[in-house]
C-alpha cells in the first residue's frame, strides 16, 4: 500500500511538472515560437541541465517509439493454448456431449477470443458444447477438467452473427472446484456459476455473470467490461486497468479492489459500517457510502470493529461503493 501511494505521488508530480512546462513554454512562445524540451529546461535551471543532453535523450526516446509502434500486434491466438493431443476443429461444430455429472468433473477452464461465448444451464445432467463460425476450436475433458478453447475472426456464421459463437451447457446447480475464464476480444456471458475458486480475466472484451457463487473470486479487467449482476462470495479480489467493472452482491469476509484508470462500482449487501477499511487514493475519485476521498495521495484506515474488511486502491480512475 505504501508503494502504491508513493507511486501515485510521483505520477502526480510528473503530471504537474509536465503541465507547468507546457504552460510556461506556451506562454513564452506566445503561440508562434517553438521551444524544445532541452531549451526550456536549460533556461529554467540556469544551465544546470544541459540542453544538448536533454534533446538527445528526447530524440532517442521518440525514435524508439516510432521504430517499435509498428511492432505492436495483438493476436488472439497468441493467448489461447491449443493442445496438440486433441483435434482442432473449425467452422460449425454440431452439439455434442462432453460428459455428465457422474463422471467426476471438477474444474472448468475457458480460453476464448474474438467470439461470442455463452455458458448456459443444461436441460439434463449432461455437459454439452456447440460452436459456429470458429477459426479454431477445442472442447474436451481431461483429468476431470472441461477445456474450452477457441478463436474466430470477423465473419458471418450460419446464423448471420458477426464472428464465431460457442455455447457450453452445464447441469443446473453444478459445483466446480476451480474455474478459470480467460477472454480476449468478444464477449462471454454466464447464466449461473457455482465454484470454489474463480479466476476471470477480460482483455478488451465484455464478460457478464447473471449469478455467481464463489468462495474466492479473482476478477481482472484490462480495457474491457465486466458485470456481475448477483454475487455471493467469501473473498473477492477485483482489479481494473482502463476498463470498467460493476459488481452487485454479498461479500462475507474480505473485498480487495484496485483501479488504475478505469471505473469500479460496487453495490454491496449490508451497511457501510459492516466493514473495516484500508483506503488509498492517488489522483482519482474514491467514494464509500456517504464518504468521499478525493485529492492527491490520500490514505485512510477505518476500524468499525467489523467482521469484514475492505481494501481499496484508486490511482487515476473512479471507485464507488454503495450499500443496499
Question: Positions of the model-derived regions?
Answer:
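Short linear S-[DN]-x-LW-Φ motif typified by the pepsin-like aspartic protease active-site region
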Residues: 26-152, 157-182, 187-197, 208, ...
